[in-house]
A protein has these predicted regions:
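Residue-level recognition of short, solvent-exposed, well-ordered loop/turn junctions
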Residues: 35, 219, 235-236
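Short glycine/threonine-rich loop-to-helix capping motif typified by GTGT followed
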Residues: 66-69, 230-236
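Extended mid-to-C-terminal alpha-helical interaction segments
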Residues: 211-215, 219
Length: 236
């Protein structure tokens, strides 16, 4: 929860309803995870934050194997997480920062429902931008969080640096978009967008269907992070 914010009585009751049965079962389950994530979102919005999009993570086989996840994770993106290209970010504000490269879909129309497919994503997308995502867990423990922690924590989103040069989805073969991560002038890793569920369009469609299960949909103007096509690398 945001620093200094206490849970309201109704939120405590809601958490009890989620965590009590989860303790008995030994697992939270999707509904419990989404409930906690939505409570955090509601707290942030109450403090003046604005929902600016959603993200899906662990979309590559390499990242799922690294974290032990069986499916992608997901979370909400807020306005204060966007950083201008070329800006400096203080490391003192970060906990366990990692960096990823991926594609973001900026929507020109609402997107949601149980049957969203690749065609729906293409029709709803106004343009695509290349972002760098700084992944950062708000949990005190070091290393990559588990999928339970991650979903409760907005899929471990820290900051987003969105590049320029917007491209319409029909102007490129998205699967073949490549990227390389440099650190101090040395390539750490490179990859192509096809590593993201075969095509990042598929990950956005998956996310739209997943969010629909909890009554959430993507809105026109939202930025959707489709998932990294390389492993997450430490900044330091």
């Amino acid at each position: 929860l945001p620093d200094g914010e206490a849970l309201q009585d109704e939120e405590v009751t809601l958490l009890q309803g989620v965590l009590g049965p989860a303790f008995q079962r030994g697992k939270l389950g999707d509904v419990g995870l989404q409930t906690i994530g939505q409570m955090v979102t509601d707290q942030k919005v109450a403090l003046g934050r604005v929902v600016k999009g959603h993200k899906v993570g662990l979309t590559s086989k390499a990242m799922r194997e690294r974290t032990g996840a069986t499916e992608p994770d997901y979370g909400t993106i807020f306005d204060n997480w966007f950083v201008d290209e070329g800006s400096q970010v203080s490391m003192s504000t970060l906990n366990t920062p990692l960096v990823e490269i991926e594609l973001s879909f900026v929507l020109g129309a609402d997107l949601g429902g149980p049957t969203v497919n690749a065609v729906d994503v293409i029709r709803a997308t106004e343009f695509i931008l290349p972002p760098v995502e700084v992944v950062d867990s708000r949990f005190s423990k070091r290393g990559l969080p588990g999928v339970v922690d991650s979903i409760c924590d907005a899929a471990s989103c820290g900051f987003i640096i969105v590049g320029g040069n917007p491209v319409a989805p029909g102007d490129i073969d998205i699967r073949h978009v490549g990227g390389a991560l440099y650190k101090n002038g040395v390539i750490e890793e490179s990859g192509t967008a096809a590593a993201v569920m075969g095509n990042p369009i598929n990950s956005v469609a998956w996310l739209a269907r997943k969010l629909h299960e909890f009554g959430v949909h993507m809105e026109a103007g939202h930025t959707i992070l489709s998932g990294s096509f390389i492993r997450a690398h430490p900044i330091a």
